[in-house]
Amino acid sequence: MVSIPLILGAIILLGTRKAATAALPPRPCAFAVTAATDDTCQSLGAQWGIGMAQFLKWNPGVNCNALVAGKTYCLSAGDSELGPTASLTPSPQVPTTSRATQTMTSKASTGTLVSRSGPIKFLNGMAPDCLFYHPVSPGDTCQSIVDRYKAFTLDQFYTWNPSVGKNCESLWLGYYVCTGVKGGPNSPSQQPPSQQPPSQQSPSQQSPSQQSPSQQPPSQQPPSQQPPSQQSNTSQQTQPNVNSKCKFHIFCLGTLAYMAFD
């Protein structure tokens, strides 16, 4: 017959072991994502290929009926059977730096990871006056993006994208980063001014000083009209016996007739 003290001791020991197990802190999260407004435990698990049991294990105490938008949720812990070579297909936050690639997957630099489905994602804290963007692709680094555009410095890139970190440790695949701000090195205001076409006015609309000699029309002035005093005397030099003081031939004829009559 088992004694009562032995039974009590076994119960106390079992309860102590359970309490010790529950008191163990969770292992560090190796990979986490930020929940969007419409995300749920089921949607995150489906998008990342994570089972509900694993999701609940890595996020103890989570309320799947009300995920908090903007809060991070763990998708891979240090004790995960996924391990460092796991291939999670959606990758909104898989960094492309060598450190992050080793942490999450060895395939990040080969281009096998694709962007997470959904709307375009931008890094937090991006410059509010950003006009130009670049989608982070596999193999990208902050310096390679600067070298690609050759229109801004690395310090400017860090200023426009503070979320990437001081050493570009948080450059996430599938996210857009700012590569130009309003009034910046490669903004439209810095483009050379457009060259307006030459004037399309016809020669008749241009002033004479603007027209070339070949374009100026020939003079259209009417022939000069000399006053009567300067006209030739051919009309006055008529037939003989015409009065030299006569101005009109008909009157001269009349005068001659009158003189002849007189």
Curated annotation (Swiss-Prot):
Pfam families: LysM. Glycans are attached at residue 233. GO terms for cellular component: extracellular region. Residues 86-112 have a biased composition (Polar residues). Keywords: Chitin-binding, Glycoprotein, Repeat, Secreted, Signal, Virulence. GO terms for molecular function: chitin binding. The keyword Nuclease does not apply. Residues 1-22 form the signal peptide. Residues 85-112, 184-240 are annotated as: Disordered. Residues 215-226 have a biased composition (Pro residues). It is found in: Secreted. Residues 197-214, 227-240 have a biased composition (Low complexity). Might have a role in sequestration of chitin oligosaccharides (breakdown products of fungal cell walls that are released during invasion and act as triggers of host immunity) to dampen host defense. This is LysM domain-containing protein ARB_03438. It comes from Arthroderma benhamiae (strain ATCC MYA-4681 / CBS 112371).
